[in-house]
Amino acid sequence: ASYKVKLITPEGAVEFDCPDDVYILDQAEEMGHDLPYSCRAGSCSSCAGKVTAGNVDQSDGNFLDDDQMADGFVLTCVAYPQSDVTIETHKEEELTA
């Protein structure tokens, strides 16, 4: 399956289709969008975003705790879309505040 991913970035919103077996960060880059990242392994907060609609599977990550995930935070480098999803990017400062 493939889902519509909408990213709300500081530069504005971008939308693209993302297969459910491709990480959102990888697909965004494939489509020419620059997003912050560091480890690419779900072990830091550089790529953190916030899901405002839809669902993701980020079970490959280990940095976020249950409360942070419940608040909507997502690591885009290990997030697969599970539905059409909207994510606010560049949320590392908010996450670590």
Curated annotation (Swiss-Prot):
CDD domains: fer2. [2Fe-2S] cluster binds at C39, C44, C47, C77. The keyword DNA damage does not apply. Pfam families: Fer2. It is found in: Plastid, Chloroplast. One of its GO terms (cellular component) is chloroplast stroma. GO terms for molecular function: 2 iron, 2 sulfur cluster binding; electron transfer activity; ferrous iron binding. Gene3D superfamilies: 3.10.20.30. GO terms for biological process: electron transport chain; ferredoxin metabolic process. The keyword Plastid applies. Residues 3-93 form the 2Fe-2S ferredoxin-type domain. Ferredoxins are iron-sulfur proteins that transfer electrons in a wide variety of metabolic reactions. Belongs to the 2Fe2S plant-type ferredoxin family. This is Ferredoxin. It comes from Nicotiana tabacum (Common tobacco).
